[in-house]
Amino acid sequence: MFFEIALIGTTASGKTYIANTLAREFDAVVLSLDSLCVYKEINIASAKPSQDDLASIKYFGVNLLSVNEHFNVELFIREYQKAKEFALARNLPLIIVGGTGFYLKTMIDGLSEKTLESKSSLNNDEIYTLLLNIDPNYKIEKNDTYRLKKWLGIYEQTREIPSEFLKRTQKTGVLKDIEIYELSWDKEILKKRIQTRTKEMLDNGLLDEAKILFSKFDHKLKALNSIGLKECKEYLDGEISFKELENLITIHTTQLAKRQRTFNKKFQSKALEFDKALAILRMKFSIEK
């Protein structure tokens, strides 16, 4: 029987493990909402599902683009529509999973009218200062270059307060009344999980993946400045030691987890402790099916 749920949580919270386990047991379709898993060439830095997982589970939202190709949330909306059509036609459950909460939020709330990203030479600090003066209710992290440029683009092209423009032009979302489950962890335990995952990524060839990526593509590309790869670039350039590389990836990933936890408060979700999550969701899937 078709039904859909969203599974959210911070990086290293075990979302993919839970989703894959349920997908295998209940023949579910999985839509990944991850800003790095879309890239064909990034496998370790993205913590992408394994080749075995991708071969045995019907996945959408993975391995869609090359690193030098640009995408936005509309890509995930199209992938959702494909995934839902596939699941509906076969009467299968659909699991939406991923750490990029912004994409899920947009799919629920709807897109606003298109505007171009600003080509201004202003840096993040300058745009952020402008935002605080003009549109203090619009919440963007100071280091979120894409959304800051998008905000400035709206202001430049419309001369409206961007938060008001977005509200006025917003369209209906594609996701309605979806149950959202959030995996929860004690902060210190999650930090240890992040440390362990960082070590595993390095042991599994993260540096080799980074070398190949930086030899083939412009290091200024957004995807190559993601956590895990930007630190590898510093190490490969001789700017930091291997120990510093491991520590920096862990620190930056922990900071990301904190931002994700804050963003996820925007959702009306049901908190699930990781150790109990699988049993609770198995029961739900059994009842729905």
Swiss-Prot record:
List, in alphabetical order, the Gene Ontology terms for molecular function in this entry: ATP binding; tRNA dimethylallyltransferase activity
In this chain, the stretch annotated as Interaction with substrate tRNA covers 34-37
A Pfam family annotated for this UniProt entry: IPPT
Quote the catalytic activity from the record.
adenosine(37) in tRNA + dimethylallyl diphosphate = N(6)-dimethylallyladenosine(37) in tRNA + diphosphate
Q: Where does ATP bind?
A: G9, T10, T11, A12, S13, G14, K15, T16
Q: Which domain of life is it from?
A: Bacteria
Return the annotated site residues (Interaction with substrate tRNA).
T100
Give the keywords, sorted.
ATP-binding, Magnesium, Nucleotide-binding, Transferase, tRNA processing
**Matching SUPFAM superfamilies:** P-loop containing nucleoside triphosphate hydrolases
The similarity annotation says:
Belongs to the IPP transferase family.
Q: This protein is called what?
A: tRNA dimethylallyltransferase
